[in-house]
Amino acid sequence: MKRDALFNMIEQQIRPWDVSQPDVLRAFHDMPRAGFLPASHRAFAYMDTELPLVIDGVDTHTTLLTPRVLARIVQAVDLKKTETAAQVGLGDGYLTALLAKFAKSVTVFELNESILYFAQRNLNQHAVRNVNYELSWGLKNGVDQYDVLVLAGS
């Protein structure tokens, strides 16, 4: 059932949104979204809907982007293994994991400590190691040190 939902997400949501790069589609296949969501939302992991980020029963007032939007972002930034990325706004860590598959490193900036630790735990559980974490509003030292900048939160 989960594999069918993952397949449908890729074929019926992501591809129709003009995401066609094989390596991006493979990244979504190899990094299932459900593993990044709170248990209460895993049943909705592959639906084309924004989900609230609830951590330990507490609403963080953060909304997670849909898979098709995440795929569009990953394809658009077109990261290379020699490039570094900065991501402002962390969410559940799923976008970070996808970006990290393509980048030399990703530095994430998050204001909410519980979101940062939740995402960090998710990324560690999925063996994503090329991520640096900053508990701050982000980019206090400018953007020149990064090849790509992704604004994923506001």
Regions found by a protein language model. Give the residues of each.
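N-terminal auxiliary segments of SAM/dcSAM-dependent transferases
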Residues: 1-45
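Conserved alpha-helix/loop element of class I SAM-dependent methyltransferases that forms part
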Residues: 11, 45-55, 63-83
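Conserved nucleotide-cofactor-binding alpha/beta core module
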Residues: 74, 78-154
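Alpha-helix boundary/capping detector
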Residues: 36, 40, 53-55, 99-100
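Alpha-helix N-capping/helix-start residues
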Residues: 21-22, 67, 113
